[in-house]
Amino acid sequence: MVLIRVLANLLILQLSYAQKSSELIIGGDECNINEHRSLVLMYYDGHQCDGTLINEEWVLTAAHCDGENMEIQLGVHSKKVPNEDVQTRVPKEKFFCDSNKTYARWNKDIMLIRLDRPVSNSAHIAPLSLPSSPPSVGSVCRIMGWGTFSTTQETYPDVPHCANINIHDFEVCQAAYPGLPATNRILCAGILEGGKDTCKGDSGGPLICNGEIQGIVSWGGHLCGNVLEPGIYTKVFDHLEWIRSIIAGNTDATCPL
């Protein structure tokens, strides 16, 4: 798993934490074919990420999933036996919190992609709602993706896997990852007993609570699904104004500090 190398002065983070970029769900089961209509599969530079369709022309994912030669697939369940309504797109434009595409702060691992042409809703394709309010601590939320389901070797599934995890206090993640900046623009989510988690290949995918996208898979412990090591998710609610401004055409909009 790729080690975090964002803040040079946070050496302990560099040594201990792993980003889930080019990063299946650990401890999950095959998703119901109808429950992930907004889930997007992305390939770039030989890597894999996930994303979320939020309207017919826009996909929300992680900034660290940016790369060249990106292909975006919608309506996918089985990679080997594609659905008849699978649609493929490429980015028309990409937007980041910072114009230099950096996400040095842990609250800026977010990217908004405008597709080259609109997507048509179908049996296996539909957008997911943006959050109406932030999730409360203790909420049960859904993770999903085509990432590896093994913590010891990269074993990727043919179909996406899903699992339920819980929202935790930010302090839980601060205790798990010493040196984590005191910011409230991320969500701390997972199973403290371990065994269920996002992992390599799930980056950029959604954390779904009550039918809304509340988080974007960002990073976590060096081994996925470890005890007392929840995952770190970009908090979508805190970026709503930026998202809506970009979609409305205000490309100079900036993310919250």
Swiss-Prot record:
Its EC number is 3.4.21.-. It is found in: Secreted. Pfam families: Trypsin. Residues 25-248 form the Peptidase S1 domain. It comes from the Eukaryota. PROSITE patterns: TRYPSIN_DOM, TRYPSIN_HIS, TRYPSIN_SER. GO terms for molecular function: serine-type endopeptidase activity; toxin activity. The keyword Iron-sulfur does not apply. CDD domains: Tryp_SPc. One of its GO terms (cellular component) is extracellular region. Its main location: secreted. Keywords: Disulfide bond, Glycoprotein, Hemostasis impairing toxin, Hydrolase, Plasminogen activation, Protease, Secreted, Serine protease, Signal, Toxin, Zymogen. Glycans are attached at residue 100. The active site is at residues 64, 109, 203. Residues 1-18 form the signal peptide. Disulfide bonds join 31-162, 49-65, 97-255, 141-209, 173-188, 199-224. It is an enzyme of class 3 (hydrolase). The keyword Glycoprotein applies. Snake venom serine protease that may act in the hemostasis system of the prey. This is Snake venom serine protease Haly-2. The lineage of its organism: Eukaryota, Metazoa, Chordata, Craniata, Vertebrata.
